[in-house]
UniProtKB/Swiss-Prot annotation:
Ranges for region Disordered: 49-78
Function as written in the Swiss-Prot or TrEMBL entry: One of the primary rRNA binding proteins, this protein initially binds near the 5'-end of the 23S rRNA. It is important during the early stages of 50S assembly. It makes multiple contacts with different domains of the 23S rRNA in the assembled 50S subunit and ribosome. Forms part of the polypeptide exit tunnel.
Gene Ontology CC: ribonucleoprotein complex; ribosome
Originating gene: rplD
InterPro entries attached to this UniProt entry: Ribosomal_uL4, Ribosomal_uL4-like, Ribosomal_uL4_dom_sf
Similarity remark: Belongs to the universal ribosomal protein uL4 family.
Protein name listed in UniProt: Large ribosomal subunit protein uL4
Length: 207
């Protein structure tokens, strides 16, 4: 069973914490992680691209000239696709790019990236992150005490709004609740700082 040090806010070690091996001690599956990242990035696409087809372009309701007798090619509308200013054929329309992987696959992906963080010694567990007021300076001091000076993902308990407000203005710091833990945020940050309460919530969901 994986074991990591448990720290206090002042940076001093406060014992150790045992991690669930089924979540933090598996062999990472890179293929599944890749699929999960592609899924998340697809859901971030706006999908608002659009063109005007011949029914949406302004004008063109009148036949430009009679069908026969002019010597010219027959035309039904000046907004047909072959005309300058005409509608576009088979152009992009607004759509949603989001899709879902099976739940087991999504869970295997998050377990894989968490296990990789433990293997890389990039997981920092803190007993709690409690602040009297949402002060950015106070949160920055905590990160300094924990010797975290790179891009970091901070995972908090779902109801710890004070700490979330204190950290939201810090550069290279991403704060999410335990229920929002996802593959893309974990791999986009060098360090993962998680409170003991949030760790329990994550293990409860993924176990």
């Amino acid at each position: 069973m994986p074991t990591v040090a448990l720290f206090k806010q002042d940076g001093n070690q406060n014992g150790e914490v045992q991690l669930n091996e089924a979540i933090f001690g598996i062999e990472p599956n890179n293929n599944v992680v890749f699929d999960a990242v592609i899924m998340q990035r697809a859901s971030l696409r706006q999908g608002t691209h659009a063109v005007k087809n011949r029914s949406a372009v302004r004008g063109g309701g009148k036949k430009p000239w009679r069908q026969k007798g002019t010597g010219r090619a027959r035309q039904g509308s000046i907004r047909s696709p072959q005309w300058v200013g005409g509608g576009t054929v088979f152009g992009p329309t607004p759509r949603s790019y989001s899709y879902k992987l099976p739940r087991k696959v999504r869970r295997l992906a998050i377990k894989s990236v968490l296990s990789q963080k433990v293997a890389d010694e990039s997981l920092v567990v803190v007993d709690a992150l409690n602040f009297d007021a949402p002060k950015t300076k106070a949160f920055a001091e905590v990160l300094s005490n924990l010797n975290v000076n790179s891009k970091v993902l901070v995972v908090l308990e779902d109801d710890n709004t004070t700490a979330a407000l204190a950290a939201r203005n810090l550069k290279n710091v991403t704060v999410i609740p335990a229920k929002g833990l996802n593959v893309l945020d974990v791999i986009n940050n060098d360090k993962l700082v998680i409170t003991q309460g949030a760790l329990s919530q994550v293990e409860e969901v993924l176990a």
